[in-house]
């Protein structure tokens, strides 16, 4: 069991069960939530209940098949195979080893090219926003003074965006209203919401509230309050008219309702059916 501090929140997980239903919308059941709470309550002085849970998310990871039917006993490692000329296959693995997987896959593909191809260097390439991070962190007080934002706000944004914070601060400098907190999602600036649409490829409201930010699991109302202000902020960037704003907000509300309903269900089949009442947009 993991109990991970995450800002003002704690992440508790994970379950380890098979999922044979819709792959695009895996859903946590009430039994899944109770399972995690039951385990964490063994070590807490004050027990948690489902009423204490702000948000829930579920995902899938591919496991290599084996002799056991129990997912907990299957390998978390990955394999790279070259089953046919020009075809490289990666199976298994997980998010935390994605760079090792990428290196192994590229090195395997390069072996089929012939000639002197250097090894993949992906594991040594800094992530986007990482180059110069420490120097900018050391300047966080100066960034706060220059932008008029509190230094704690700058620190949070640096941890989320790295040195790309300068792009958000440029938006704030051009429109100081974007330096205000998002109504209903005060851990984020309005400028961060606009940035999700202008620089990070968000196309729909749920892209912003559930993926570019984590507002959908960081508040008890699942970002319902923040949904319309967020939609209105990105409307000029994405070319939305009033009808599209209403449609995006309504779809997000339906998504939240479907997720909430799925998390009251006792089994996977019922949770899957509930979640699919509001599938994500492509």
State where each predicted segment sits:
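C-terminal accessory subdomains/tails of enzymes that are appended
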Residues: 5-9, 15-282
